[in-house]
Amino acid sequence: MNTEPTWMAEVVFDENGLIPAIAQDAETGQILMVAWMNREALAETAATGRAVYWSRSRQRLWRKGEESGHAQDVHELRLDCDGDVILLKVHQNGGIACHTGRASCFYRRLEGTASQAEWITIDPVLKDPELIYK
């Protein structure tokens, strides 16, 4: 007997059983991070209202904030037009989404002309990662 929710049938997972998941601040619209979800992570996120991802490096569920305390409360889940990307509109507890101690993982901007361009860090570290991940 299949206990998977009916809405899950519309979600298109890749050949590894994963789907990219974009976390966006529900109030400001700022993109915080991109991670991956499998069926179990998506189902748990929908059931609990807390962001759960699949860690490809650790090969296990990653409950955002389980080590750092920077959990994500999910206000809304959206599925893109092709069904192959999830958008989570979240409240980022502690204001830090990135393991580098920044608000967003997108803290570098490409500046300069194409042949002379370089990535420039534009967002500050809000908290030393050494203090976050003790």
Swiss-Prot record:
Extract the PANTHER family matched here.
HISTIDINE BIOSYNTHESIS BIFUNCTIONAL PROTEIN, HISTIDINE BIOSYNTHESIS BIFUNCTIONAL PROTEIN HIS7
Cofactor binding description: Binds 1 Mg(2+) ion per subunit.
Binding sites annotated in the UniProt record for Mg(2+): D80, D82, D84
Q: Which cofactor does it need?
A: Mg(2+); Zn(2+)
In which pathway is this protein known to take part?
Amino-acid biosynthesis; L-histidine biosynthesis; L-histidine from 5-phospho-alpha-D-ribose 1-diphosphate: step 3/9
State what protein this is by name: Phosphoribosyl-AMP cyclohydrolase
- Annotated gene: hisI
Q: What is its main location?
A: cytoplasm
One Gene Ontology cellular component term attached to this UniProt record is: cytoplasm
Source species, please?
Bordetella parapertussis (strain 12822 / ATCC BAA-587 / NCTC 13253)
Complex and partners: Homodimer.
EC code: 3.5.4.19
The reply on keyword Ligase is no
Write down the top EC class of this protein. Answer: hydrolase
Q: Name one GO biological process term.
A: L-histidine biosynthetic process
Pfam families the record matches: PRA-CH (PF01502)
